[in-house]
UniProtKB/Swiss-Prot annotation:
Homodimer. Possesses an unusual extended V-shaped dimeric structure with each monomer consisting of three distinct domains arranged along a curved 'spinal' alpha-helix. The N-terminal catalytic domain specifically recognizes the glutamate moiety of the substrate. The second domain is the NADPH-binding domain, and the third C-terminal domain is responsible for dimerization. Substrate binds at T50, C51, N52, R53, S110, E115, T116, Q117, Q121. It catalyses: (S)-4-amino-5-oxopentanoate + tRNA(Glu) + NADP(+) = L-glutamyl-tRNA(Glu) + NADPH + H(+). GO terms for biological process: protoporphyrinogen IX biosynthetic process from glutamate. It comes from Sulfurimonas denitrificans (strain ATCC 33889 / DSM 1251) (Thiomicrospira denitrificans (strain ATCC 33889 / DSM 1251)). This is Glutamyl-tRNA reductase. NADP(+) binds at G190, V191, G192, E193, M194, S195. Its EC number is 1.2.1.70. It comes from the Bacteria. The record marks H100 as: Important for activity.
Length: 432
């Protein structure tokens, strides 16, 4: 069994490419996961699709075959050639895949280092795949350790001491271009976590905030929680020409603000499009200042410089957590093998005991004593060997040892991990 992660992120792909690779709703995500798992060598998969990344994390029996299947599937859906996808993607397998997963969960791979949204997005992606039967024990183990690693990073470093997000960075950008936002009318489109954070930051800065959404009662609920006002989505065509400030982060697959509804204004407008695919597509409007996710990089770089020390410490934690994860996986392989060795030895002792009794070498009335004695002999003989097997599970040569023992006891390696329940998998689900 192998782990494989194919990653398209803000580090290797343009916004245009990420838009084409994005999956905006549950229906599309389910279709993608179904096609992923239809690959001959892929047995479990998780799809992570956010404004800054699209990643496939899977377990597979053959890395080359699984990689080929994933690229063919993504190319067919997105219209981006396989050559371009291969040129852009970061491909991680086995230990590097786990290391990358832990980095993503700990927000070390985020555009905004230390942002807290990615952990929730990762949990949502895992739950969706798990609840719909697209992943099970193999990925659940990795995800559980990823969340544990993220918690260690948060507790041991200061990278999340001042929580930041793309939304808070966008509001910071607004403040850098506008001297004062107090009293200015600001429209927030959408009701997701990013919209909520944006609305709260704008309100705390004194802006007059309105929230709108296709589903009005959701806008009313968020506005009530934040202390904002509600704007009917049907009035969006008026609002874009009346409001000075606009933030949008919807899950629409098509732009919702286009040339058709934009009119000339005698004041500057500041629009922030944090959606992928983008919500705004226009070709006119001289006094419109539009910022998309990738335009926030300057502030992000400043954020990174503030958190460099914490990030270095976090990388060390992630490295150690990766090693500990594979040591733990090795113990899952070792214990079943030790159990099977004992079972085979006891069965051989039982057969031999019955044989000598049947031949009359030992009286029948001593049968129980013979069984106990033979088992005690075997336990004494196997104890030292099993102790060494357990101790070596934390060493680099563990893989060689487990392969050799699997060969000797004629056990299929693919059977072993799934035979033993991961006690953490249910905890992840129950801890939602």
């Amino acid at each position: 069994m192998h782990y494989l992660n194919i990653s398209f992120s803000h580090k290797n792909s343009t916004l245009d490419v990420r838009e084409k690779l994005s999956y905006k709703d549950d229906y599309a995500t389910k279709g993608c996961l179904s096609k992923l798992n239809s690959g001959e060598s892929i047995n479990e998969s998780i799809l992570i699709s956010t404004c800054n990344r699209m990643e496939v994390f899977c377990s597979c029996s053959d890395i080359a075959s699984a990689t080929k299947h994933i690229f063919e599937m993504l190319a067919a859906r997105s219209g981006v050639s396989i050559d371009e996808l291969e040129g852009r993607a970061d491909i991680f397998d086995d230990s590097s895949a786990i290391h990358h997963l832990f980095s993503v969960a700990s927000s070390l791979d985020s555009m905004v280092i230390g942002e807290t949204q990615i952990a929730g997005q990762l949990k949502d992606a895992f739950r969706f795949s798990y609840d719909n039967g697209f992943c099970s024990q193999k990925l659940a183990r990795a995800m559980h350790h990823a969340f544990k690693c993220a918690a260690k990073v948060r507790n041991a470093t200061d990278i999340s001491s001042k929580p930041v997000s793309i939304a808070s960075v966008a509001v910071s950008k607004l403040k850098s271009v506008l001297d004062n936002v107090e009293g200015k009318k600001a429209l927030v489109i959408g009701v997701g976590e990013m919209s909520e954070i944006t609305a709260k930051h704008l309100l705390s800065s004194g802006a007059d905030v309105y929230i709108t959404n296709r589903t009005k009662h959701k806008a009313e609920k968020l506005a009530s929680e934040c202390g904002a006002k509600v704007l009917d989505m049907q009035d969006l065509h008026k609002a874009v020409n009346e409001f000075e400030i606009l933030f949008t982060a919807t899950s629409s697959s098509e732009p919702i603000i286009t040339d058709e509804i934009i009119k000339p204004c005698d004041f500057d407008r500041y629009w922030f499009d944090m959606a992928v695919p983008r919500d705004i597509n226009y070709h006119k409007g001289d006094r419109i200042n539009l910022y998309v996710v990738d335009d926030l990089k300057n502030i992000v770089d400043q954020n990174m410089s503030f958190r460099e020390d914490g990030a270095r410490k976090a990388h060390g934690i992630i490295g150690r957590s990766t090693v500990e994860f594979f040591e733990w996986l090795n113990t899952l392989n070792i214990e079943p093998m030790i159990k099977e060795i004992y079972e085979k030895a006891f069965e051989a002792a039982r057969i031999e005991s019955q044989r000598v009794i049947k031949k009359g070498f030992i009286p029948k009335e001593y049968e129980d004593q013979i069984h106990k004695m033979s088992q005690q002999v075997l336990k004494r003989f196997l104890h030292q060997m099993s102790s060494k097997m357990r101790s070596v599970s934390e060493e680099s040569k563990a893989d060689m040892l487990t392969s050799a023992v699997q060969f000797l006891i004629e056990k299929d390696q693919r059977d072993i991990p799934d035979k033993y329940k991961c006690e953490h998998a249910l905890n992840i689900i129950e801890g939602r």
